[in-house]
Amino acid sequence: MYGYTLFELKSFNLKNGIHHIPLELPWSSPGFVNVYLIEDKDGFIMVDCGVNGDSYYSLLLEYLQKLEINISDINLLIGTHMHSDHIGLSTKIRESGVPFALFKNSVDFIDDYNDWSLRFKNLKDYAEKHNAPTSFLNDIASINTPSYAGKISKPDILLDEGEIKDVKRNLTTIFTPGHDRTEISLFDESTKIIFSGDHILPKITPFIPTDNENEDMLANYTQSLDKIYEIDHEIIAPGHGDIISKPHSRIEQMKLHHKRRTEKILSFLQNSDFTGWEMVENLFPRKLDALNLRLAFQETMAHLIYLENKGKIKQETKNNSIYW
């Protein structure tokens, strides 16, 4: 089933009792999620766990065996955010007696995680409001909850910002919403490593989900970047890809990416008004598959809302359509 033998992929050389597992995913990009094991007390804290499925659970156990770690050695599983590639296996691991932790606001999104028709309903309504074509709306309406997401229930532990209780290491939760409303990063004081989930990635910028106009997700994201920037850290261990050895430089790059995108939108709007969907087509002229088109729409709307809240642009209704 798998395209790689165990540990054929490079595992990070992290220090002070931190182990890394590149766990395969059922899609090609990104092809792996980074699972981390942090030594603590008489066992380990696991950060993220991959997608649901017996084969993926077996693969995780093989990796653990290679590290001479048993599932019973895991004292705590922490999910950085509520995406299936990070917490899909959580219920299976909980069945082994491992307590599961998410940020405290996760309880508000459990139903959406378990039923993707609920999760995408707001997006469909929002896309229709901003002149998305019928084919796009039909694609959203056809989405079903995939088996690789698994089902989750209320976590055993609801994390708040600050030092995590009942662990030996000085491990701190940092609330970093933007890519996901529940996203957290973890700071290990002894190594000055930040485990960033999908908040900060080495090669790409995570997409910013947007399905309503009441939340400025891009503002949340940039504020979360600033929060990490101010912490005295040396390395970022991301949810995908290689370690980030120059974290402050990477954060500056990511902020510049969003600045340039907002500038591009403003340049389009200098000479003409556009609907939300027309702006998607301007920013992403190449033909995209269904998934990437959904991401492009949300990313575009996130930037439009951000600019509107900055007072740079505004919406107005003409001929029963919303224009920017």
Question: Could you describe each region identified by the protein language model?
Answer:
Residues 52-56, 63-164, 245:
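Active-site HxH/HxHxD metal-binding segment of metal-dependent hydrolases
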Residues 17, 38, 48, 81, ...:
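Divalent metal-coordination and catalytic microenvironments
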Residues 15-23, 142-148, 167-169:
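Short Pro/Gly-enriched beta-strand edge/turn motifs at strand-loop
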Residues 28-30, 159, 177-180:
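A short catalytic or substrate-binding loop motif that flags glycine-/basic-rich loops and adjacent residues
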Residues 44, 51-53, 144-149, 170-262:
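Metallo-beta-lactamase
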Residues 1-5, 264-324:
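C-terminal regulatory/interaction regions
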Residues 7-13, 35-43, 58-65, 72-77, ...:
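A structural signal for the main folded, soluble domain(s) of proteins
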Residues 8-69, 185-197:
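Conserved beta-strand hairpin/beta-sheet module of binuclear metal-dependent hydrolase folds
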